UniProtKB/Swiss-Prot annotation:
It comes from Drosophila melanogaster (Fruit fly). Disruption phenotype: Adults develop normally, however females display ovarian defects and reduced fertility likely due to the significant decrease in mTORC1 activity within the germline cells. Ovarian defects include adherent cyst divisions due to mitotic delay, accumulation of autolysosomes resulting in reduced number of egg chambers and reduced number of eggs laid per female per day. Spindle defects and mitotic delay results in egg chambers often containing 16 polyploid nurse cells and no oocyte because the oocyte enters the endocycle and develops as a polyploid nurse cell. Belongs to the WD repeat SEC13 family. This is Nucleoporin seh1. Probable component of the nuclear pore complex (NPC). Involved in maintaining the localization of another nucleoporin Mgtor to the nuclear envelope of early meiotic female germline cells. It is not involved in recruiting the nucleoporins Mgtor, Nup107, Nup153 and FG-containing nucleoporins to the NPC. It is found in: Nucleus envelope; Lysosome. GO terms for cellular component: autolysosome; GATOR2 complex; lysosome; nuclear envelope; nuclear pore outer ring; protein-containing complex; Seh1-associated complex. SUPFAM superfamilies: WD40 repeat-like. It comes from the Eukaryota.
Length: 354
C-alpha cells in the first residue's frame, strides 16, 4: 500500500527537481525561485528543511547528490548558464545542548557553457568524483575533481558535441560491456529525428564519443534514466517523452563491443499526456513515471517479463488506484503442463530407512 503525504515546500515558484540522497534520508529540491532546499527526515516520517539558500541568478533546473564516500556534496545547474558544486560544512556547537550549525558552501562554479545548463549528474562511485553537465548548446561536459579534499578544482576531462540541444542525461551505473556509458535526450521539436543519444568512452581515441542514436523516439525528451544493473546481460534505459519508453541495449555479435548495439524500444501510452520524469528502484524491478496529468505511475514486470502499470498515485492527496493484475493460468492449463511419473520397478538391496 502507498500513502500520499503532501509536504509544504515553501518554494516561491515552480519546483523543477526533487532528489533523495544515497540513503534516502535526505532530500534536495530546486526551483525557479533560484533557491535550493535540503530536507532531513526526522525518523518519524516527517521532512524538515535544514538548509535553504539562493544558489543561482536564474531558474535552477536540476540538483544531484554525490556518493556519500565523497562527503555531503550536491551539484546544481541553472538557466544562468552555470553549474555549481556545494559542500555541507558543520560548524561548532554553541552549547552542549545544541546541535552543530550546518551550512552549504559553494566550492566552485563551472562557467564553460554559453547557454542554459539543463542537467547535471555525478558519475557512479567507481569512476571517481566525476560530474557531467548537459546544456542547450548540445554539449556534454565531463569534469573531474583530482583531489576530493579540494573541491574548488574541476578541470574538464571530456567535451562531447551534439547537433541538437540537450535537455537531460543519465550515467549508466553498470560496468557490463563498458565502464563509461552515458545517455542524453533532446527536447528539440522541429526535427523528426532520434532524440536519445548514447555516448561511451573509446579506448582508441581516449575520449568519449557518440556511439548510437535511438531512432524510434522522435518526440521531445524530458528525462532519461538508466536502470541499476541486477545481474542482467543487457542495459535498460527509461525515457520520458510524449509517451513512456523502456529501451533495452544489447551487444550484437560481441558482448564486449559496445560500439555495436541491438536497440529494442518498448512504448507505453497509458499516461495519455507528456511524461516528465522517470526513475527506478534499487533492483530495477519497479519503474516510476510522472506525467502532465499530475499522476505518478508505478510499473512492474509480470511473470511473462512484460512491464505493466501496477498503481496510479494521484496528486492533491487522493488515494492510489491499483491496476488489475493479469489473469493467472487456470488449473487446467497448469495441470496440462505438469510432468507425470510412473513406477517402472524397484531397486534391490535398498538401505533400510532409520
Amino acid at each position: 500500500m502507498f500513502d500520499v503525504e503532501p509536504i509544504i515546500a515553501d518554494h516561491k515558484d515552480v519546483i523543477h527537481d526533487v532528489v533523495f540522497d544515497y540513503y534516502g534520508r535526505r532530500m534536495a529540491t530546486c526551483s525557479s525561485d533560484q533557491t535550493v532546499k535540503i530536507w532531513d527526515e526526522d525518523g518519524q516520517g516527517k521532512w524538515n528543511v535544514t538548509s535553504s539558500w539562493k544558489a543561482h541568478s536564474g531558474s535552477i533546473w536540476r540538483v544531484s547528490w554525490a556518493h556519500p564516500e565523497f562527503g555531503q556534496v550536491v551539484a546544481t545547474c541553472s538557466f544562468d548558464r552555470t553549474a555549481s558544486v556545494w559542500e555541507e560544512v558543520i560548524g561548532e556547537k554553541v552549547s552542549s545542548t545544541n546541535t552543530p550549525t550546518r551550512r552549504w558552501v559553494r566550492r566552485t562554479t563551472l562557467v564553460d557553457s554559453r547557454t542554459s545548463v539543463t542537467d547535471v549528474e555525478f558519475a557512479p562511485k567507481y569512476l571517481g568524483l566525476l560530474l557531467a553537465t548537459a546544456s542547450a548548446d548540445g554539449i556534454i561536459r565531463i569534469y573531474e575533481a583530482p583531489d576530493i579534499m579540494n573541491l574548488s578544482q574541476w578541470p574538464v576531462q571530456h567535451e562531447i558535441s551534439n547537433k541538437l540541444p540537450l535537455s537531460c542525461l543519465s550515467w549508466n551505473t553498470s560496468t557490463y560491456m563498458v565502464t563509461q556509458l552515458l545517455a542524453a535526450g533532446s527536447d528539440e521539436a522541429a526535427t523528426p529525428t532520434g532524440k536519445v543519444f548514447l555516448f561511451a568512452y573509446s579506448e582508441n581515441s581516449r575520449k568519449c564519443v557518440k556511439i548510437d542514436t535511438v531512432n524510434d523516439i522522435t518526440d521531445p525528451v524530458t528525462d532519461v534514466a538508466f536502470a541499476p544493473n541486477a545481474g542482467r546481460t543487457f542495459h535498460m534505459l527509461a525515457v520520458a517523452s510524449k509517451d513512456l519508453y523502456i529501451v533495452n541495449l544489447r551487444g550484437v555479435t560481441d558482448a564486449t563491443d559496445i560500439s555495436k548495439l541491438d536497440i529494442q524500444t518498448i512504448k507505453f501510452s497509458e499516461h495519455n499526456c507528456p511524461v516528465w520524469r522517470v526513475c527506478w528502484n534499487m533492483l530495477a524491478t519497479m519503474l516510476i513515471s510522472t506525467g502532465d496529468d499530475g499522476c505518478v505511475r508505478l510499473w512492474r514486470m509480470n511473470y511473462n517479463r512484460q512491464w505493466r502499470c501496477a498503481a496510479v498515485l494521484k496528486a492533491e492527496g487522493s488515494g492510489p488506484t491499483y491496476e488489475p493484475a493479469p489473469p493467472t493460468p487456470t488449473l487446467a492449463t497448469t495441470a496440462s503442463a505438469t510432468a507425470k511419473f510412473y513406477k517402472k520397478g524397484t531397486i534391490g538391496n535398498q538401505v533400510p530407512w532409520h
